[in-house]
């Protein structure tokens, strides 16, 4: 492997698209024709090589991006197969971060679908050069030219058509190569392994000439010398055209468009040629952004085998035979098994044990890997997704990946006490694999709450918990984390006295409670706190050793508010006076007095119920704006801004979390799946009185 494993010979690519556009089938054919797979796996038979989790084979969708390595010509192609369902966009995001190029697969019948728009935007975010493969050209209703128009209209992309289809629907036979100006026809009986070149059919000559002229007009703009040659009527060679297509693809000046039918085994070999010819090698990318740990400086690090080792972990998977597998993309240097490296994000050392090259769920042990490689490491302990592994002597932190906040949550509880411990272990393992899946405990209800990117996402998590960890669980409805606060200043003087023979209990406290936003002299370090305690005792009215008891009592009791039992936040308590007894006073007595003072004093502060407000961002095509804004208003939302972004609109609104349950499904139906949204916690705000009455009644 090392002989040809030079950086310019590597292509790290992703194959991504909308669900059902045919990504996994396309990948299967690539593996078949590059000699990695001896039998073609069909998704609809549940036998695809890349779809190796049970749930994927049952549902016929790809959930985890399986990584695989294959060869074409003298190049090594590392392929990440990505899911197309909207609930799994995190997998796509993780893949795009470590890729150098991508193939976007489109359904020749449906064209640019909603998830295609999402994936395209994600690829824009990471500046991933890409090309387009219009698949399913054999299907009824397939229309290549309509697809090309949709690339312009819906994605705002600049397509560069380099192939045209020969025949349509069931008569689809092959393609016209606009670079060579030849037709390429496949033999059905040879499962697509045999194909031949012939002259362009007479009825397609004019169309081919028209699109060849468009192609040349676009590529010659990238080179003055070739443009002069072209304008003076000289022939532009195929080599010159290929060089300029490569240049334009890498700089995102345009996106080459190819066509075929992966299912019918037509068009896959020219697609592989295009991957090798036009998509970048790690050398073309050249640098990776990061931070030097010793200086804290942000800088660009060269992608090179001779530089110190640096790699980004982009995925973790539990393998039934090897255990936990960490997928890394090596950006610089090389690594051998047995080496010790450092996780610079967590400042922990990791020893490299087994190193594996993955082919879907088959694996091959390797002793060494270097810049440009994507490998799986077995047995890492402290590394999570987005962490950097680095050379110990020259430490760097590569640009971290950003993951969206979960948008849906459910309560889960084990069906039996025997399942309790197993469930905790299962959930923590699944959360380590997937940064968009979170687990927390609701302290008010004691429930375990799981959070994810959509209902299908959580459904599959629960399914995996059952299958892989043998844990049965009951699924409940989630609850909103309400809070309480006071809205005016109040003062309470309370004496706790207990005498029942022997040592008694005595403590007197005088406390002022005030809303934090009304405190004028608030210290900087207290500005982000939910609760502030201060003692202004002068002259020993309450001895110093008893004051921590007052703070502890208030801290404990504020977890149960006075309206509906939700935690009390955003207030300051100031101890201004008190009294003690030489014998009967104690820390405990002052703790009890503080709790009672809270219970008696807080109702005088005009307490109010608070609810979490989320900042919601919806990205939608223009035509759905009215419906989406109307729906957000009906959810007690307040529209903050509306801005154009490319050929879409971005609506930002503040909406109570309680009104956002089920929103993912509403948005899908309002926009036919074309809009997407994300939400993050913004702040707590008062609940309107009529809503507060309903919440109190439920408690």
Curated annotation (Swiss-Prot):
What does this gene product do?
Catalyzes the GTP-dependent ribosomal translocation step during translation elongation. During this step, the ribosome changes from the pre-translocational (PRE) to the post-translocational (POST) state as the newly formed A-site-bound peptidyl-tRNA and P-site-bound deacylated tRNA move to the P and E sites, respectively. Catalyzes the coordinated movement of the two tRNA molecules, the mRNA and conformational changes in the ribosome.
Q: What is the scientific name of the source organism? A: Rickettsia rickettsii
> Can you cite a GO biological process for this protein?
ribosome disassembly
What positions does the entry give for GTP binding? 17-24, 81-85, 135-138
Query: Belongs to which family?
Result: Belongs to the TRAFAC class translation factor GTPase superfamily. Classic translation factor GTPase family. EF-G/EF-2 subfamily.
Query: Which residues are in the tr-type G domain?
Result: 8-283
Kindly indicate whether the keyword GTP-binding belongs to this entry. yes
Instruction: Provide the GO MF annotations for this entry.
Output: GTP binding; GTPase activity; translation elongation factor activity
Entries under InterPro entries matching the protein:
EF-G-like_DII (IPR053905), EFG_II (IPR041095), EFG_III (IPR009022), EFG_III/V (IPR035647), EFG_IV (IPR047872), EFG_V (IPR035649), EFG_V-like (IPR000640), G_TR_CS (IPR031157)
This entry carries the following GO cellular component terms, namely: cytoplasm
Q: Could you tell me the gene encoding this protein?
A: fusA
Note one Pfam family from the annotation. Answer: GTP_EFTU
Principal subcellular localisation of the protein: cytoplasm
The record lists the membrane-crossing segments as none
Its localization reads:
Cytoplasm
Ordered alphabetically, the record's keywords are: Cytoplasm, Elongation factor, GTP-binding, Nucleotide-binding, Protein biosynthesis
Q: Which domain of life is it from?
A: Bacteria
- UniProt keyword Cytoplasm present: yes
| Stated name of the protein | Elongation factor G
